[in-house]
Amino acid sequence: MAYIESNSGKWEYVIGLEIHAQISSKSKLFSGSGTTFAASPNSQVSYVDAAMPGMLPVLNEYCVHQAIKTGLGLKAKVNKYSVFDRKNYFYADLPQGYQISQFYYPIVQDGTMEIPTSTGELKTIRINRLHLEQDAGKSMHDQSPHYSFIDLNRAGIGLMEIVTEPDISSPDEAAEFVKKLRSLLRYVGSCDGDMEKGSMRCDANVSVRRKGEPLGTRCEIKNINSIRNIVRAIEFEAKRQVDLIENGESVIQETRLFNADSGETRTMRSKEEAADYRYFPDPDLLPVILSDELINELKASLPELPDQKIDKYITKFGLSKYDAEVIVADESAAKYFEEAANECDPKLLANWLINELFGQLNKASAEISECKITPNDFAKLIKLIEDNTISGKIAKTVFEIMFETGKAADKIVEEQGLVQVSDSNVLNTVIDEVIRENPDSVEGYKGGKDKLFGFFVGQVMKKTGGKANPGLVNQLLKEKLGS
């Protein structure tokens, strides 16, 4: 467990998260309007979205199905009876004067998700609920020095709000939870998890306490838009609360905003309670009643989920838990790996994927879907290493050319004459030359300077242009030098 260190001792973090995940649907939750990102302002707005008098909402069945599938992925209870409520508050980008949400009877509740901790152990985070609600519009304050404008394109888009219990004990655990949840949503297909575009947003409820003491007063930090900022916002807020308490002041329950430039939180408004929103069932929408048949059908349609894939990669492919988790975290990377793993050694493949391919993709700020190397061609590169056609060092050169050009490994090796030298007669000739040219080093090695062995290997590799089989060079050198 992580602690906040202060002059008076250690304090514990107590953190709960609320994740707003935009449902990957072509139409909104209660209207047929489109949901295309970055469309022209107010180009995807129906009379329902604009709250014109007499316009009634019609529930999008696809959004309901996506919420059910997400709930099943979270090992949660899917409620056969759920109700939409009106959450009443005024804001300029909320044309109805209320938000349609689910307060009393959510569609999903009582789920769990396991996350890795700093000790390497798994920790279970309880999911209190997942409910459906509509998004608000967007206020635009940078278009004019005199006016604010409203874009209702986002108004009415379906959201899943996923609420955890306060089981998270450090900023890093919060980040791990969000990363794992995002991965799950992408596998299920219910949300693309793109925090930069706002399709996944995070609110953090943060309080502090001494070990064994009751829960402290919490503050909610709104709309954190990146994994890194989740960590920064929680760290700052917890430290702020500790400083207040140690100076004899009280923490006020409130909603705060995080400023990514300053790394600080600031007051947004006093924290509302449920009574402030005057929730009541929406009279324009019937309760959602689900059948066992539908729930079972959606359960059967779920793909292999991240935890299942990790187990498979460890048992079937022999990967380490770390390697399996790194690959499975990205669904596209997992598909790439599985396609290539049928053609070569999976463990060597995983090593090259993580250390070489992912590294190059990060440098290029590219996704694996943009990679010019096909899974089949990547597998062929691994096979060339496996059968000693090329050395690992040469393979890195070949890989870099493949990454830039998309050319097949065997063609690059053939065109540039990079085939590894594994002929003992040829290598013995080179080794004899090296020994003849370096009598002092030979004498030093035989006199006990073992580190000189690396010098001889380097000389052989230099004379062969790095093409000599390093394993065979080591073996032959030991025979020649009598070690």
UniProtKB/Swiss-Prot annotation:
SUPFAM superfamilies: GatB/YqeY motif (SSF89095), Glutamine synthetase/guanido kinase (SSF55931). The keyword Protein transport does not apply. Keywords: ATP-binding, Ligase, Nucleotide-binding, Protein biosynthesis. Its EC number is 6.3.5.-. GO terms for biological process: glutaminyl-tRNAGln biosynthesis via transamidation; translation. InterPro entries: Asn/Gln-tRNA_amidoTrfase_suB/E, Asn/Gln-tRNA_Trfase_suB/E_cat, Asn/Gln_amidotransferase, Asn/Gln_tRNA_amidoTrase-B-like, GatB, GatB_C_1, GatB_Yqey_C_2, Gln-tRNA_amidoTrfase_suB_CS. It catalyses: L-glutamyl-tRNA(Gln) + L-glutamine + ATP + H2O = L-glutaminyl-tRNA(Gln) + L-glutamate + ADP + phosphate + H(+); L-aspartyl-tRNA(Asn) + L-glutamine + ATP + H2O = L-asparaginyl-tRNA(Asn) + L-glutamate + ADP + phosphate + 2 H(+). It is an enzyme of class 6 (ligase). SMART domains: GatB_Yqey. One of its GO terms (molecular function) is asparaginyl-tRNA synthase (glutamine-hydrolyzing) activity. It comes from the Bacteria. Gene3D superfamilies: 1.10.10.410, GatB domain, N-terminal subdomain (1.10.150.380). Heterotrimer of A, B and C subunits. Allows the formation of correctly charged Asn-tRNA(Asn) or Gln-tRNA(Gln) through the transamidation of misacylated Asp-tRNA(Asn) or Glu-tRNA(Gln) in organisms which lack either or both of asparaginyl-tRNA or glutaminyl-tRNA synthetases. The reaction takes place in the presence of glutamine and ATP through an activated phospho-Asp-tRNA(Asn) or phospho-Glu-tRNA(Gln). Belongs to the GatB/GatE family. GatB subfamily. This is Aspartyl/glutamyl-tRNA(Asn/Gln) amidotransferase subunit B. It comes from Rickettsia bellii (strain RML369-C). The lineage of its organism: Bacteria, Pseudomonadati, Pseudomonadota, Alphaproteobacteria, Rickettsiales. The gene is gatB.
